[in-house]
């Protein structure tokens, strides 16, 4: 049982990936790789691990299930989300749903209530059923389907990384180590910015960073809404990009925008 506990997602794994960024950049520089590898690095950071893996897959599909997709796309979502280094869908969804229920309180797992140091994942509050009781059908569904990944997450991650390394050291470096580390830092900063002032807010970043979910207040007002652009001039890049996966959206959670000012 103790060995199994080490294989499960934990804050140590994610923090280690975060802190590896200087090493990754140094190794990238001394590798004398062409600019194409650095372009690939930025692509994996912004599109693969952030926009697809976190925003679309882990956040909107696995956690809130705002839509349904085909089986091959589900596996793609599982891989892109897991390779970001932030755990499996079960741990992610549980933490996020607790965040929604106890937002900006001492029981919130992350954000300004945990202090600026929570930009590092090791300072997130550990989700405990005793402190933050949460019974959700979605978590039960995810546990039945992806319990194996929750139990053997570290093995899954190491095997995937090993395959990358075996194909080409630069694939490991520019398609995982550097971009995954950038992603974890970006996510750590995002959860602080989204609740700066101890309240959910829409941030200026939603217009200038397409890979960033900046309409966070809108999301908290309607967590099941597939499109969080409620007002004139707003655009939900994650929703727009997710349409390439031919999803079947559940529009029951979408508010009547005519009543929103």
Regions found by a protein language model. Name each.
Residues 1-187, 225-261:
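Non-catalytic, topology-defining segments of multipass membrane proteins
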Residues 189-236:
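Glycine/small-residue-rich hydrophobic helix-like segments
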